[in-house]
Amino acid sequence: MEARRHSALKDSVRSIPDYPKPGIIFRDITTLLSDPRSFRRAVDSLVHPYAGGRIDQVAGIEARGFILGGAVAHQLSSGFVPIRKKGKLPHKTVSTAYALEYGTDEIEIHVDAIKPGDRVILVDDLIATGGTATAAVNLLRQLGAEVVAACFVIDLPEIGGAQRLRDLGVTVRTLMEFEGH
């Protein structure tokens, strides 16, 4: 049943070759999100391992992590914490820079979004290099969070981001894998 559910989810993801540049296959989850059954299955699958447990906050990475993370937080009766690109949050923040293929970027979180000891799940749509997710885990830990898991709809295992998080001691849950970049 679980394998069939994840196969149907995988079929709901649109693959766009040579976007944003030649040689890349973009995995577009907007088709999954727009299909009520697929969206529900994805959220239910992300929630299932943590239902009935104590999760204080769900942190979502901008932008699709907001959609998924908000739905997960709602089902877990947890709070939701946005992790945004620098300059997008109105209150006092802490931030961290991380490497991109060409240059760096920076994400931030409100300083009062997490209380020390909060049990937090990190949610995003896809893990590739793990750069943004690693930076998010570091921010959450800096504020005293216990990062229970990092959850993604899609993993691109050849790129190694999920393993990078595991090397930091983070449990990683994904719903499907795609080969390539």
UniProtKB/Swiss-Prot annotation:
Catalyzes a salvage reaction resulting in the formation of AMP, that is energically less costly than de novo synthesis. Homodimer. Its main location: cytoplasm. It catalyses: AMP + diphosphate = 5-phospho-alpha-D-ribose 1-diphosphate + adenine. It is an enzyme of class 2 (transferase). The keyword Glycoprotein does not apply. Its EC number is 2.4.2.7. CDD domains: PRTases_typeI. This is Adenine phosphoribosyltransferase. Belongs to the purine/pyrimidine phosphoribosyltransferase family. It comes from Methylorubrum extorquens (strain PA1) (Methylobacterium extorquens). Pfam families: Pribosyltran.
